[in-house]
Design a protein with these regions (language model features):
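N-terminal acidic leader/helix
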Residues: 2-28
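Short, charge-rich amphipathic interface segments used for partner binding and complex assembly
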Residues: 29-73
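Short, charged, intrinsically disordered terminal tails
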Residues: 73-79
Length: 81
């Protein structure tokens, strides 16, 4: 089996965040991964289109985690916007 590309690895890591129960922790982790994803692009490990795809997935996940957190009736304790 061929080794996964950096894009596939990063996408898998983002997908893994969907399993987290704590939406606020998932948001923090998502924000922490942003610079890592950018570094993959700057180091030419992912293509421009792959970077755009990862950013789009990240933005969608951010909205999902915010909605999850707000659905609990508890305030967000971080500046996410």
């Amino acid at each position: 089996m061929p080794e996964k590309s950096e894009f596939d690895k990063a996408l898998g890591e983002l997908h893994d965040l969907t399993e987290w129960e704590d939406a606020e922790a998932a948001l923090r982790e998502l924000h922490a991964r942003g610079p890592e994803i950018e570094r993959l692009y700057l180091d030419s490990k992912i293509l421009p289109g792959e970077l755009r795809a990862l950013v789009m997935v990240s933005n969608c996940l951010e909205r999902e985690f915010i909605h999850r957190r707000l659905a609990t009736g508890q305030p967000l304790h971080m500046n996410v916007l």
